Design a protein with these regions (language model features):
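Alpha-helical membrane segments of multi-pass proteins
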Residues: 5-270
Length: 270
């Protein structure tokens, strides 16, 4: 008699679409389109952005739209955890900083003004850091992760939470409003975020068992076992976060050193 897990795998295999087929999440396609439309309106009414800023913002919107409306979505929600984790880092770690960097200073000032006290509170490092970490770990809890994969409404909610948390996390890194942080504070903030979030990827890398029952029962691609799939997902997550945070922290470290040099020159010039 086949085991319950084998039976579940057979049912999923029957219902799973071809890995190369497109999946669509219209809500994120609409949101990405609306973001670009709003950006164009701001560019006309507030401040004309440089081509570089336009490219950054559009790339951020495209990452959200394409990661959730493509074969990547199909493989992520029907076959492999590593592809789902790739989706998550694209919408949580890549797209948000690109969107924030794509805004001009005048655009950020307008957003900060309209965000009012709520944005001022949410973008305080001591508030946003634990919120960001709570969303990051909460979304990846096995019980919620497995349930969301079987209930699209919750999966969409989780993806939306990752995007929103990413935006408020990266806002104080690249925007001086509503709070102007020193380079030293931004450096510590980013370091604490990386250190705090790394435990998840390390657990995925070194665990001897698969955490997510959905992917244990899912049809396999390219001969990847559930455990190997999970280990690769952890390596991917850890590697990309290391790269993203290293680049950001390196920038602010150079800024800090430059500020120290300027202060020293000012003292010597007295």
């Amino acid at each position: 008699m086949p085991s319950p897990r084998a039976g579940a795998a057979a049912r999923i295999a029957v219902t799973a679409p071809a890995a190369s087929s497109f999946s669509f999440e219209p809500v994120f396609l609409v949101l990405a389109t609306a973001a670009v439309y709003g950006y164009v309106r701001l560019a006309k009414r507030v401040e004309r952005p440089s081509r570089g800023r336009v490219a950054l913002f559009v790339l951020g919107a495209l990452l959200i739209a394409t990661s959730l409306n493509s074969p990547l979505e199909t493989i992520a929600v029907h076959y492999l955890l590593v592809f789902h984790l790739l989706q998550n880092v694209m919408i949580a770690d890549w797209a948000p900083p690109l969107l924030v960097l794509g805004l001009t200073p005048a655009m950020r000032a307008l957003v900060a003004a309209r965000g009012g006290r709520a944005l001022a509170l949410l973008t305080r490092p001591r508030v946003v850091l634990p919120v960001w970490l709570a969303v990051w770990y909460g979304v990846h809890l096995p019980v919620l992760y497995d349930y969301a994969l079987r209930h699209p409404w919750l999966l969409n909610l989780e993806h939306g939470a990752l995007i929103a948390a990413g935006l408020v996390f990266w806002w104080p890194v690249f925007s001086d409003l509503p709070h102007r942080l020193s380079s030293a504070v931004r450096l510590v903030y980013l370091g604490a975020a990386y250190a705090g979030s790394a435990f998840l990827s390390l657990a995925l890398i070194f665990s001897a068992r698969a955490f997510y029952g959905f992917y244990e029962a899912a049809p396999r691609l390219w001969g990847l076992s559930p455990q190997k799939d999970q280990n690769l997902g952890g390596i991917l997550m850890n590697g990309e976060q290391l790269a993203v945070f290293f680049v950001a922290m390196s920038y602010f470290l150079l800024q800090l050193l430059s500020e120290d040099e300027e202060s020293q020159r000012a003292l010597e010039g007295r």
